């Protein structure tokens, strides 16, 4: 019958106080402490979720294409202190649930170690840390993500230790802006989410303002991107260096290479080829928050030619330039 967490106690106190006189604010009191301010912020964030209905028949624009084995995707909106869970329903993203979250004290778009910000981008769960392997501060479990990713490092961003995790055992939830950059959930919510997270597979897409689109728009974008990747694959098989290299930006980079060195290398390699076959499978495509027209494309690649065979997991960052 009684509340079990701090915000609920604050609301209960307001309800009792309202019997005596009208309230002027949440946590009606003069000279509010920092804790009261934090609780008010949490109340506003939670109330906003119920006042603003979920977009009907719309999904985050980032969920362009799941790979077949990717069962779920996580989308975080730091601006609304909300985490959304979507299921891969035969390639179509279906809303499952959403949860209140805490993010970085200094806001979003992490740049460097210790800036107290939550990163924005497309990330993937890299590990599952049970309660027995972490301190009580992190709650019932933790799921590290791959910040900084390849794009972050290219932008000169650094830092480490960005996790999805819970809260201490004596706490139910934390204020909207209270972490050092991690995404923090109440322990019951983390436990619910944990069942659907796949290490190495589940994308965690973090935005400061999630954009929603209808299914038709998303399907059209999926078709366009699939065709662009297929054109790239086919032009690679053609051994026509000009056709192949037209897919690459002049600002292209790979470990130890820029566009100029990549251009020279591919022309030299193609000169020794009489045939090339490239098969792509298990491909996912996710839009990158804050970078219009940029997509993270991940796939299994099976390459064979007259003088080389290899298989690898490849991740590329595609961007429409012209």
Give residue ranges: language-model regions.
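Gly/Pro-biased beta-strand-loop elements
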Residues: 51-163, 168-173
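Exported/periplasmic cell-wall-interacting domains
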Residues: 129-230
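Alpha-helical linker/edge segments of TPR/alpha-solenoid repeat scaffolds
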Residues: 16-59, 275-278
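Surface-exposed, charged secondary-structure patches
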Residues: 265-315
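Short, well-ordered alpha-helical segments enriched in acidic and aromatic residues
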Residues: 238-255
